[in-house]
């Protein structure tokens, strides 16, 4: 999958630089995810009222929905410092120990991709989260002894796109677990308008709405598209993003009315044209598209499932009637129920 794909919800280096300037600082500035925000507001107010660290918190959901932003907001609301790291970055137990021993009372430790922590690191994290203690082994061989080092009370905020990959012991140590969902069109419009204001881009309400509704319910994608449409407006128009300018730019970027790009349409056409609409196994589909299995599961499928264009069945992926209609293809009337169909092209599910 190309790193330049606009509707890829995963972050890249350019996104990270811009996102810092666009990131909300308080819960009142955070747009969308109303249930999560309200629960956090109550939890933060209670923790501050008791002068305690916030309970360990886990955010999960598709990428680009604001898990890192919420972690920063929580730290700001708590008046605490935040240390940001990720599961793959903590390779050894000693790496985690070094981070933990530098935390101050009520600090926030944000671990992105927390499901990718290795087992040795998790073993160190368990007592740190539960007892606010660090168990160290001093020495080697018969003379080795265990030493427990007390830690200040702090908050671990974990973020993951793959909740099922978290081990049960780690998941159980998060007191609060919040699921982030795709944003509504109204919230996306508000996010685009806010980002344009911060970036100094003139935009009409209709232009903001057009970008927002094609951004797949994902703020990161909306902000990325906004920057590209801004460039188009600057060069082709008078610099203002109107409805007409937004539509012209999005057409040039090959992002359709529902936010699908050519890669999404290629996946749907592959299922329909190469595998008779499915079912087709994930590995088979990945091979046909020359894509990674993880890319299909993490990047393509969540939004296609949300739209109802794709179904996951025990025997593989299936394109729905909606997918056929969106691509302008006739939907075949099946003589047998889907679960009874067979064919040499179905592949394997895993």
Swiss-Prot record:
GO molecular function terms attached to this record: ATP binding; ATP hydrolysis activity; four-way junction DNA binding; four-way junction helicase activity
Listed EC numbers = 3.6.4.-
Does the UniProt entry include the keyword Cell membrane? Answer: no
Q: Which UniProt keywords apply?
A: ATP-binding, Cytoplasm, DNA damage, DNA recombination, DNA repair, DNA-binding, Hydrolase, Nucleotide-binding
Q: Which family does it belong to?
A: Belongs to the RuvB family.
Q: Which CDD domains match?
A: AAA
Q: Which BP terms does GO give this entry?
A: DNA recombination; DNA repair
| Region described as Head domain (RuvB-H): spans on this chain | 257-350
Location in the cell: Cytoplasm
Q: What is this protein called?
A: Holliday junction branch migration complex subunit RuvB
Residues noted as binding DNA in the record, renumbered to the chain: 312, 317
According to the UniProt record, what class of enzyme is this?
hydrolase
Instruction: Tell me the segments the record calls region Small ATPAse domain (RuvB-S).
Output: 184-254
Q: Which cysteines are joined by disulfide bonds?
A: none
* Keyword Zinc recorded: no
An example Gene Ontology CC term for this record: Holliday junction resolvase complex
């Amino acid at each position: 999958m190309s790193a330049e794909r606009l509707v890829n919800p995963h972050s890249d280096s350019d996104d990270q630089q811009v996102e810092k300037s666009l990131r909300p600082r308080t819960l009142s500035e955070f747009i969308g995810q109303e249930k999560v925000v309200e629960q956090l507001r109550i939890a933060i107010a209670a923790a501050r009222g008791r002068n305690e660290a916030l309970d360990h918190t886990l955010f999960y959901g598709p990428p680009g929905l604001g898990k890192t932003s919420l972690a920063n907001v929580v730290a700001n609301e708590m008046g605490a410092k935040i240390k940001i790291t990720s599961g793959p970055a903590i390779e050894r137990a000693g790496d985690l120990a070094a981070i933990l021993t530098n935390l101050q009372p009520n600090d926030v430790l944000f671990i992105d991709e927390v499901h990718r922590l290795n087992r040795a690191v998790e073993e160190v994290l368990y007592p740190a989260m539960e007892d606010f203690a660090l168990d160290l082994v001093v020495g080697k061989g018969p003379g080795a002894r265990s030493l427990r080092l007390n830690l200040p009370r702090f908050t671990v905020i974990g973020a993951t796109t793959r909740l099922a990959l978290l081990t049960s012991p780690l998941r159980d140590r998060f007191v609060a677990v919040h699921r982030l969902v795709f944003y509504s069109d109204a919230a996306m419009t508000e996010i685009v308008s806010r980002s344009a204001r911060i970036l100094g881009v003139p935009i009409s309400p209709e232009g903001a709405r057009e970008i927002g509704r094609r951004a797949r319910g994902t703020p990161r994608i909306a902000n990325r598209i906004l920057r590209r449409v801004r460039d188009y407006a600057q060069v082709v128009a008078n610099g203002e993003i109107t409805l007409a300018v937004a539509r012209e730019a999005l057409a040039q970027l090959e992002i359709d009315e529902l936010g699908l790009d050519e890669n999404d349409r290629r996946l749907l056409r592959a299922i329909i044209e190469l595998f008779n609409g499915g079912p087709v196994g994930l590995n088979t589909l990945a091979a046909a598209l020359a894509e990674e299995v993880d890319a299909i599961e993490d990047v393509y499928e969540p939004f296609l499932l949300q739209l109802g264009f794709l179904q996951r069945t025990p025997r593989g992926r299936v394109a729905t009637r909606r997918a056929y209609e969106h691509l302008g293809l006739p939907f075949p009337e099946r003589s047998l129920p889907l679960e009874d169909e067979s064919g040499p092209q179905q592949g394997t599910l895993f």
